[in-house]
């Protein structure tokens, strides 16, 4: 109930400014895909979309399950990998996420979501090395 009220207030403030609100899935009970959809549906918050955090989905019920459940509401994605044990924010391909399968599922979404690489900085990386890794990551998609 508190989440619905908070989102209603945010929507009322954001809408006149042309700002689109998104909620993000998290690992844990509070923001699972099922719970996010329940909040959005019960609150009739049809204008609020979802930012699918692929790494968080990998730590919960899995990426394919999250995409299947949220597919109609996904407007953006946070793209990072992990090994299923912690929110490591690794480069895509450096963890256990099956990216080919995930991207195939996302291609079936009604809208093509924006993709944001959400990667932890590694000490000593240069702008050039980060750009090269980002290029390789987006080639997967």
Label each region the model flagged:
Residues 1-49, 59:
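Active-site acidic/histidine proton-transfer and metal-coordination neighborhood
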Residues 3-6, 10, 102, 134-141:
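Alpha-helical packing segments of well-folded alpha/beta enzyme cores
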Residues 18-22, 47-51, 74-78, 85, ...:
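Structural preference for beta-strand elements that scaffold enzyme active sites
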Residues 23-25, 54, 119-121:
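Short glycine-centered, acidic/aromatic-flanked micro-motifs in structured strand/loop junctions
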Residues 33-41, 56-112, 120-132:
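Gly/Pro-rich active-site loop or hairpin
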Residues 41-49, 70-73, 134-141:
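Structural recognition of alpha->loop->beta junctions
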